[in-house]
């Protein structure tokens, strides 16, 4: 099956009514930083859907199997009309990370809100303070092309 790369900002535009993210990967292109341990390349996160809810987990490399497996600790979870996501990871190094909660409104598209939460997470996770930014490019969605 053909693969596609989609810009998250394009998917969040008001004219985009439907967004398919189940089974896709959210990729964050990064620059190297020795202080925070950020490596150059891309960090990948898997999106899974159970019923109407989504979970986003970082993919961790398993050297034994030479495979990538989702971490046990999700960065985003939806539960009906609520979305939970991790913030304040590196941007504010003097405080602990927290789980932010947002209630979805009836007009909200859940998939778009998951992407919004991911952008908030990535913007925080790949920064140190307000001036050390390790994003090499905008995060994007990668996966099988939907017909």
UniProtKB/Swiss-Prot annotation:
It is found in: Virion. Its main location: virion. GO terms for cellular component: virion component. Keywords: Virion. This is Virion protein 4. It comes from Enterococcus phage phiEF24C.
């Amino acid at each position: 099956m053909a693969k596609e790369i989609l810009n998250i900002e394009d998917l969040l535009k008001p004219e985009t009514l439907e967004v398919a993210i189940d089974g896709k990967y959210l990729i964050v292109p990064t620059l190297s930083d020795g202080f925070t341990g950020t490596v150059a390349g891309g960090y990948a996160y898997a999106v899974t859907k159970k019923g109407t809810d989504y979970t986003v987990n970082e993919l961790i490399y398993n050297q034994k199997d030479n495979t990538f497996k989702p971490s046990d600790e999700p960065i985003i979870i939806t539960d009906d009309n609520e979305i939970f996501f991790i913030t304040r990871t590196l941007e504010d190094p003097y405080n602990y990370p927290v789980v932010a909660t947002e209630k979805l409104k009836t007009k909200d598209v859940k998939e778009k809100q998951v992407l919004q939460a991911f952008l908030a997470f990535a913007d925080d996770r790949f920064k140190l303070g307000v001036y050390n930014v390790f994003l090499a490019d905008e995060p994007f969605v990668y996966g099988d092309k939907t017909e």
